[in-house]
């Protein structure tokens, strides 16, 4: 089934946390399974940084980003639950973002797109569910950037969600991770084609975006995985200053592939939203915000995650416990590193099933 779309805030504007408003917001979303009569089996899936509204394709015509986790009888069981997943505000996969047409100018927003944070993304998701007449969620689940969204749901709408499942995401982004994001942003901003973000009528900043993606890929993997996959193997035809080693060729391929599916401005906005995430924003303190959580909270850490470091997840665990949150915590090692939440089904299956069944 094709992605569904709806336009909200066609009359009153949507007010953003850092100032400014948006109107006529288009939201791309997809649903799976059937909502029961009591409306007690709805689960919101929150995608990661560069994800989209289609984690799964029921006909297997394509491979969704959570294809191995979803389906009848799997951890995210489409025969038992009703799933909703929407593209985030600021994205480029159908929901209003910098590449969308600004209704005031009839041109892409570009540099005029307002600054957004996770709280705005979550507020728009709540508006979508209200439109779909879904008052309450059995669970909100997400990995990485999606885990931040899941956390904020439990804080901003404590009476609307029973379970939170946060995979590979801390409450606050670490300094090193912010540093990585800064370098990635600078690669894009300093591309000659960036033009301050107004590049839609000319060549986009492809070189900068490809470089940014290559760096990002290194934070999603582990040195062990890269060593197993490539070691020091070289290409059959080497380029002394280019793709000499196979690992270099892999990164170049990933950078080029990314250009076909993502917008540079969206990348910048979402990276900054990741950096700025603070669950306590607009509350008296972080602890006061966490104390609002009524949902059962499952937190899963990957010990060798290169992006969301184990120390940051352990700090999050401590903060949640001190705030009285009903917490279930797991940590494990995976060759996949941060990307384990996308591919390591063997480990995550039982944890997700237990969380959705309200069991330890």
Curated annotation (Swiss-Prot):
Alphabetic keyword roster: Acyltransferase, Amino-acid biosynthesis, Cytoplasm, Methionine biosynthesis, Transferase
SUPFAM superfamilies in alphabetical order: alpha/beta-Hydrolases
AB hydrolase-1 domain residues: 41-344
Reactions listed under catalytic activity: L-homoserine + acetyl-CoA = O-acetyl-L-homoserine + CoA
Binding site for substrate: 213, 339
Pathway: Amino-acid biosynthesis; L-methionine biosynthesis via de novo pathway; O-acetyl-L-homoserine from L-homoserine: step 1/1
Active-site residues annotated for this sequence: 144, 305, 338
Cellular localisation: Cytoplasm
Gene Ontology biological process terms, A to Z: homoserine metabolic process; methionine biosynthetic process
Functional note: Transfers an acetyl group from acetyl-CoA to L-homoserine, forming acetyl-L-homoserine.
Protein known as: Homoserine O-acetyltransferase
